[in-house]
Every structure is written in C-alpha cells, then in structure tokens.
C-alpha cells in the first residue's frame, strides 16, 4: 500500500512539472500572438537604426592630419592615405583618402582611435551597387552627408499608406503581363537617360 501511494505521489509530481513546462512554453507563444508582425518589407519599409549603429563612415578632409592611425588599428589595413611631405613646412599634405566598403567590416576602430575625430559612423546602410568598384569611396564621397532615414521620402508614404496590398510581394502565381513592383536595372537606366538620347534611339530604330 505504501509503495502504491509513493508511485501515485511521484506520478502527480511528474504530471505537475510537465504541465508547468508546457505552460511556460505556451505562455511565450501566446504572448507573441498578441503582438503586431515585425517583418519589414524592405525597401518599401525601412527601420530606423539605433544611435550607436555602425553604418557608412563619414570623413572630414580638413580635420585629417594624415597620421595613418586608422590604417594601423584597422584589422585589414583598409584605409588608403595618400600624402606627400611638404619640405617648406615639414608637414604632411594630404592628397587623397579612400575606404573600400566592399572590404570594410565596420568594426569602428578607425573612428575610435582617430586623434582629430575626422571619422564618424553614420546610420546609412544602403550601400548596394551594381558594380563592386563603386563601393570604393574617395574623400569626396566619404565627405558627403548621410541620408537621414527619418527624412527619407521613400519612408513617408508608407506611414500614410500603411501596408502594401496582400500578394503584391508574392512572386508566385503572378501573370507575366502584370507589372513588377520594382524596376529592372535597364529600366532604371532608360528612365534616367535624357529625352534627347531616347529620341535618337527611336529615329535610328525606325530607319533600320
């Protein structure tokens, strides 16, 4: 009789522990059911980076003293500092400064150790290009002020239009006659070309 009661007691404890574990797991699941979706339909929707986000590096040419500290602290010796020694002033004269963001790991060491604070991290993260050589930014491109995501014109319409219609991002079972959500590279190129060049192409095609 005593062994029977002990077995029942152990069975009840195991059932209680199993129910407790099940409750803990389902509580997390049900908690997420009450939340809004967190999926971001990029590039139609964009996230606002945090204050310490390590995005594209901003460079101030006038502050740089060509000390090359950024090159020494970089794990891959990435920044290219082109300078010459001025024999009259016996000081370095900076000619060009460049960073290849196709190789950069955005560790922030160059910004941390710069003695003149001529380097800073921005919130700009849209660096995609059709040619990888375009990711090599010189001092002019690095000196360009970053685009603020909060004032980006492509973000504002989404606040007004809320979410895109259902199925607009789904690539399956869409007729070939329907227009694409985005444009192909050649379509963007045609859109950016001047009207005079387009008219010349039309005339040449008609003559052929």
Swiss-Prot record:
GO biological process per UniProt: photosynthesis, light reaction
Cofactor note: Binds 2 [4Fe-4S] clusters per subunit.
Name of the top EC class for this enzyme: translocase
Cellular-component GO terms for this entry: plasma membrane-derived thylakoid membrane
Residues at which [4Fe-4S] cluster 2 binds: 74, 104, 107, 110
Needed co-factor(s): [4Fe-4S] cluster
Locations listed in the record: Cellular thylakoid membrane
MF GO annotations: 4 iron, 4 sulfur cluster binding; iron ion binding; NADH dehydrogenase (ubiquinone) activity; quinone binding
Catalysed transformations (reactions): a plastoquinone + NADH + (n+1) H(+)(in) = a plastoquinol + NAD(+) + n H(+)(out); a plastoquinone + NADPH + (n+1) H(+)(in) = a plastoquinol + NADP(+) + n H(+)(out)
Function (record text): NDH-1 shuttles electrons from an unknown electron donor, via FMN and iron-sulfur (Fe-S) centers, to quinones in the respiratory and/or the photosynthetic chain. The immediate electron acceptor for the enzyme in this species is believed to be plastoquinone. Couples the redox reaction to proton translocation, and thus conserves the redox energy in a proton gradient.
Stated name of the protein: NAD(P)H-quinone oxidoreductase subunit I
Annotated source species: Prochlorococcus marinus (strain AS9601)
